[in-house]
């Protein structure tokens, strides 16, 4: 079940600027670049002969492009495989006013090697897995189970888990082991499951360290690896001063719900179960994160949790919108406690609860939005 989707990410800045396009493996970077920049000079560093040639002599890139027109646009796919090329790219940008689109799946590889990151001469963009607005006839249940990486979402049922298993295996082998990012691959593998168990919850480094038999410093380093290899991200707590004391620890989410489903063995989830609820929240956060990044508000997401246990899953901006995600067939007053408490602190906030309700309604100033309708409103810019 293969299909190409029109991606929402805006790369039009490439008409005037250079771009770093980061994204996890199989998010569709190569397909996107080939579609958006058809006809441009293209270096695919996954091709062995191209990679070997430029690894042996990085200055050959400059020599080849000296013959190109000033200001020409050049695409280099998987730049982290030959980071030494960035010195040549820098020279070509400053001397020949050339523009580059540089893709990569690991910012960590560039940081670790202390390579030239172009001194702010390239804009940073991030490609996420597919989002609902990019898929005709979006299937919520399929997305909850298979995730939104193109090869997984469009996979047949009898192949999808093999592909997800292979994806995690390749990540461990090529991103972690081959790059010697960790000394103990077994401990890191154990950590991945511990991170999956706490995905969407406040991060407790001490508990994870104890569960994995490693120290807290190592746990923090492992989370940093997940972030810099695009496999996960932290959502900070909302810290605007108010009456109630709130927790400060961030929440962690894997970049795609399929990773958590695989690590925890969630193959067939039924509505009404805790695991279905966790996957539902994860998918909704995944969509919100992508929307905020693509719309230029990448740092606008936080969550709110008081010491008394009241919480809101997503706070947008400076408290402008508060959103709770509940995979229930019909929202009840008990599901609104966190939002109402947030409203007591920040009365100007727009309150939204996203659920499996069949129709939208307004309950005590809280918008009850069916999940698919919420996603449509989100991507039309009607939520934030």
Question: Model-predicted segments: where are they?
Answer:
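Short regulatory helix/loop adjacent to the ATP-binding pocket of P-loop NTPases
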Residues: 108-123, 139
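Pre-Walker A adenine-sensing motif
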Residues: 1-13
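Conserved lysine of the Walker
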Residues: 29-30
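Structural recognition of the conserved hydrophobic beta-strand(s) that form the central parallel beta-sheet
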Residues: 75, 99-105
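Accessory nucleic acid-recognition modules appended to NTPase machines
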Residues: 158-320, 327
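Short glycine-rich substrate-engagement loop in P-loop NTPases that contacts/grips substrate
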Residues: 43-73
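Domain-level recognition of nuclease-like catalytic cores that cleave nucleotide substrates
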Residues: 357-384
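Hydrophobic anchor at the beta1->P-loop junction of P-loop NTPases
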Residues: 21
């Amino acid at each position: 079940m293969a299909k190409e989707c029109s991606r929402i990410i805006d790369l039009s800045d490439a008409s005037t600027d250079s771009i770093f396009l980061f994204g996890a493996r199989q998010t569709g970077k190569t397909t996107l670049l080939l579609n958006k920049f058809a006809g441009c000079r293209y270096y695919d560093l996954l091709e062995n002969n191209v990679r070997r040639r430029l690894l042996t002599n990085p200055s050959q890139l400059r020599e080849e492009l000296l013959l190109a027109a000033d200001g020409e646009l050049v695409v280099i796919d998987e730049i982290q495989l030959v980071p030494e090329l960035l010195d040549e790219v820098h020279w070509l940008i400053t001397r020949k006013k050339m523009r580059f689109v540089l893709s990569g799946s690991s910012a960590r590889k560039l940081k670790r090697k202390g390579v030239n990151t172009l001194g702010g001469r390239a804009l940073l963009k991030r490609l996420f897995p597919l989002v609902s607005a990019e898929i005709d006839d979006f299937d919520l249940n399929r997305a909850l189970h298979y995730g939104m990486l193109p090869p997984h979402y469009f996979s047949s049922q009898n192949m999808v888990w093999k592909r997800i298993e292979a994806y995690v295996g390749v990540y461990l082998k090529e991103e972690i082991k081959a790059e010697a990012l960790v000394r103990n691959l077994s401990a890191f593998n154990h950590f991945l499951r511990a991170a999956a168990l706490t995905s969407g919850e406040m991060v407790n480094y001490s508990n994870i360290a104890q569960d994995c038999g490693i120290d807290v410093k190592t746990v923090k380093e492992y989370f940093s690896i997940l972030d810099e290899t695009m496999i996960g991200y932290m959502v900070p707590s909302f810290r605007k001063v108010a009456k109630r004391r709130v927790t400060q620890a961030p929440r962690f989410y894997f970049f795609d719900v399929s990773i958590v489903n695989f690590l925890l063995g969630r193959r067939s989830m039924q509505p009404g179960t805790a695991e279905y609820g966790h996957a539902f929240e994860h998918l909704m956060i995944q969509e919100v994160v992508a929307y905020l990044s693509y719309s230029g508000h990448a740092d606008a997401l936080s969550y709110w949790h008081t010491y008394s246990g009241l919480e809101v899953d997503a706070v947008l901006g400076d408290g402008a919108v508060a959103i709770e995600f509940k995979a229930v067939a019909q929202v009840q007053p008990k599901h609104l406690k966190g939002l109402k408490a947030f409203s007591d602190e920040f009365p100007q906030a727009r309150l939204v609860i996203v659920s499996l309700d069949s129709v939208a309604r307004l309950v005590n100033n809280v918008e009850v939005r069916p999940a698919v309708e919420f996603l449509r409103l989100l991507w039309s810019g009607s939520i934030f």
